[in-house]
């Protein structure tokens, strides 16, 4: 069986934990992860001044698709940059149309709203993004730490990054694989 593929879109101002933890967990599960820089291949300064080097540019990554999941990290500035990108919109719309999984965490779900993706789904987000997500009644809102409704998977923030990442693994590779990856992480149940 061919390994699953994930695209993580990295924008300036992304939240570090919400980027790195899903990348790490998915790679532990054998998922081929591409970290794509929204503004190109140059290192990206994240919300807490951690610098992450993308594998490639988003433009280049798009030519290597499709992906089994597209992941949108949060961070206020990062989510704003994702929300303002025509290329992100194109990728999300293609993913939605081909019935591929889309996962967004913290403020990342606001990019779904901006690009009119997943309307009608139940979502969650960082508590400070709730009002924005509920503007226009395009979604129903959940206070769950992780919410999966069909092919839209959302989560709340840095503290839910492991749960979010394991939910992506479970959606792509099954519960057994998620449990196998989780065991050595010494997470609190």
Curated annotation (Swiss-Prot):
Listed GO MF terms: copper ion binding; cupric ion binding; cuprous ion binding; cytokine binding; DNA-binding transcription factor binding; enzyme activator activity; enzyme binding; glyoxalase (glycolic acid-forming) activity
Cofactor annotation comment: Deglycase activity does not require glutathione as a cofactor, however, glycated glutathione constitutes a PARK7 substrate.
Keywords, in A-Z order: Acetylation, Autophagy, Cell membrane, Chaperone, Copper, Cytoplasm, Endoplasmic reticulum, Fertilization, Hydrolase, Inflammatory response, Isopeptide bond, Lipoprotein, Membrane, Mitochondrion, Nucleus, Oxidation, Palmitate, Phosphoprotein, Protease, RNA-binding, Stress response, Tumor suppressor, Ubl conjugation, Zymogen
Site, Cleavage: residue positions: 149-150
Record PTM Cysteine sulfinic acid (-SO2H), positions in chain: 106
Residues with the Phosphotyrosine modification: 67
Disruption phenotype: Mutants rear and groom less, they have a shorter stride length than their wild-type counterparts, but take more forelimb and hindlimb steps. They display deficits in short-term spatial memory as early as 4.5 months of age during place preference testing, as well as impaired coping strategies in the forced swim test.
Statement: the UniProt record of this protein carries the keyword Kinase: no
Subcellular location: Cell membrane; Cytoplasm; Membrane raft; Nucleus
Chain's role: Protein and nucleotide deglycase that catalyzes the deglycation of the Maillard adducts formed between amino groups of proteins or nucleotides and reactive carbonyl groups of glyoxals. Thus, functions as a protein deglycase that repairs methylglyoxal- and glyoxal-glycated proteins, and releases repaired proteins and lactate or glycolate, respectively. Deglycates cysteine, arginine and lysine residues in proteins, and thus reactivates these proteins by reversing glycation by glyoxals.
Name under which the protein is recorded: Parkinson disease protein 7 homolog
Organism, as annotated: Rattus norvegicus (Rat)
